[in-house]
Amino acid sequence: FADSTGLLYAHGTTYYGLKQRGNLQQGETLLVLGAGGHVGLSAVEIGKLMGARVIAAASTEEKLDLCRERGADETINYAEENLKDRAKELTGGAGVDVVYDVVGGDYAEQALRAIGWAGRFLVIGFTAGIPSIPLNLTLLKSCQIVGVFYGAMTARDPELANEIAEDLLQWVDSGELRPHISATYGLEGAAQALRSLMDRKSIGKIVIEP
């Protein structure tokens, strides 16, 4: 139960974003913001399965340790390092090919400034607030800002949604993909689980079992 909970939503969002919306190619560099959360961590895992070089960015070393365990090639602690400068340094100044942004806020512009020529910036969420971005950056870098709304896609294109589910389940069956569960609560612990999410203390996924 715990392993399957949320798989299709979080990992479905990621796979749809990276494959269909971001056109991530083998050998490209993927920068994941909010990489310590459930959705961000799924991007680290699936990015590696798709053959990308993955740079995981998160706010604590504990979260980054987990990202490294899950396959991240490089990490950035954006609570202590300048996100743009470090990402550019890790790519030899070229910038990243794809940004997977769960965070938004002030980090979104930093990540966009770290993107390379003809890069793709995937808008996934706004845990740090809805960002304001200078659109001239898209012209200067000839890059794309692309929204990823997996829930709406499943209703509009159920055939594609089924294909995504089949690919994900094949990875699960082969043992290549297994969602990380940071904590499991009973119904009586639901309030504590929600507090952990709101305080951004959780790493990976929290499951509430009936």
Please provide the spans of the model-predicted regions.
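Short amphipathic alpha-helix with an adjacent loop that forms part of the alpha/beta core around
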Residues: 82-93
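A generic alpha-to-beta junction signature in SAM-dependent methyltransferases
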Residues: 24, 91, 103, 115-116
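NAD(P)H cofactor-binding loop motif with strongest signal on the N-terminal glycine-rich segment
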Residues: 34-35, 103, 126
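N-terminal Rossmann-like NAD(P) cofactor-binding module of classical short-chain dehydrogenase/reductase
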Residues: 99-100, 122
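Phosphate-coordination loops involved in phosphoryl transfer and adenosine-cofactor binding
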Residues: 26-28, 96, 118
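Glycine/proline-rich active-site loop of Rossmann-fold NAD(P)-dependent oxidoreductases
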Residues: 197-204
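Mid-domain Rossmann-like dinucleotide-binding core that forms the NAD(H)/NADP(H) cofactor-binding site
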Residues: 1-81
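Glycine-rich phosphate-binding loop and adjacent beta-alpha segment
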Residues: 50, 61, 106-177, 202, ...
